[in-house]
Structures are given as structure tokens and as C-alpha cells.
Amino acid sequence: MADEHAFWAVTFDRLEYADGLSSNLGSVSQYDAQAWYGTSYERLVIKAEGELADNTLAESETQILWGHALSTFWDRQIGLRFDSSEGPSRQWLTFGVQGLAPYWFEVDTSLSVGPEGRTVFNLEAEYELLITQRLILQPRVVVSAFGKDDTKNGVGKGLSSLTTGIRLRYEFSRKFAPYLGVEWTGKYGNTADFAQLAGQPVRQTQWVAGIRFWF
């Protein structure tokens, strides 16, 4: 059967340039990619996202996961996650699910557990609204929450950040699409307090321009 054969794919959902609207927000480059190898039922999955500022990797998140199909539209995933930022690097054991929710919302959610009782919950949801067969509007929401304060990395217990954005892309083909958009990010709770103490913005708005492609 075809489902028993191994396949692979690499997708860059976001490869973009982002520019802040206020004078205290600089421009950055951002990426969000995923690669997998395996069958329809079992596969190795690598997820990578990050941000570059002044030609330097400012922060990154990399996950190496094993995925198992729970149903036609949902995969269960387990593996390791590695975070790096201005503070100490963090390592996690990650459990998650990824798939299509009712009404065709793309959902990627995970719970990660680290040393010293650290935990983090992440939720990302996207939806594609077809204006035409090639012009697509994509709202996106990302939520992060932590189980305890991590002062060295500037994140606090509870709801840490909420990002909402909308991107309009034009698909020259199913494999290549440039886009424009805008994104709003807010920090909350202790994370907002840590940001203010460090002289960083708690709310920010950015215009984004990039490409989405896969092979």
C-alpha cells in the first residue's frame, strides 16, 4: 500500500522580514519551518523557528519529534525541544498534537516539561480564507504560558505572550507564495513586568513581508 512507503517534505511556513512601527522597535528576520520523513502513520518531525536581529540569531526553538497518527487529521507527537535566547538555553521533553480542528483550523499544541519543574504550554492556530483560488488570507494566533518564573530568560508564570497576525499571500503555485501582513504581540503578567524592568516594549506591532514555500 502507498501509505506504507516513506515520504519526506520540507515546509517554510514563514520566512519573513518584520519591521516595527514605533521608533524603539527595530527590524528582524524570522523563520518557521518544518520537515518530516516517514509514512502516513509514523514519521520523524523536525520543527524550527527563530528570529535574527543584526545578523545574529536572537532566539530559536527547535523540536525533534516522533509523530504517530491518531486519526485521519490528527498526529500525536513526542520528543525533545531546545530553546535558546539571550539567557540560558533550555531543554524540554515535549508532548503534543497537531492537525485539523473542525472548520479546517490548523492547530499545533504542546506541553513541554524541563528540569527544576519547568513547564511551558504552547498553542498555535491558523485558518486559511480563500479570496480567490490563488489569493489567500491567513489569520494566526500563538499563545505561550509557563508554569513558573524564569527570570534569566525574562518569562513569567502564567500567560506569557499572545501573538495575533494576519497575512495575505498570493500562490504563484501551491509550492511558492509571497505574502504581506501585520502582527501584534503582547506580553502579560510577570513576563510583562520583566520586560518593563529591562526597558523592552510590552506591546508591539510589526509589518511583515516574506515567502511561504515547500518542497
Label every PLM stretch briefly.
Residues 89-150:
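Detector for outer-membrane/organellar transmembrane beta-barrel domains
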Residues 40-46, 72-76, 103-107, 132-137, ...:
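Repeated loop/turn-to-beta-strand initiation elements of outer-membrane beta-barrel proteins
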Residues 33, 64, 95, 123-125, ...:
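Membrane-embedded beta-strands of outer-membrane beta-barrel proteins
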Residues 1-56, 60, 68, 189, ...:
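Outer-membrane beta-barrel initiation region
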Residues 166, 171, 201-215:
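Outer-membrane beta-barrel "beta-signal"
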Residues 14, 46-50, 78-82, 109-113, ...:
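Transmembrane beta-barrel strands of outer-membrane/channel proteins
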Residues 6, 27-31, 58-62, 89-93, ...:
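Residues that define the transmembrane beta-barrel architecture of outer-membrane proteins
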Residues 37-39, 68, 99, 113, ...:
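Residue-level signature of outer-membrane beta-barrel architecture
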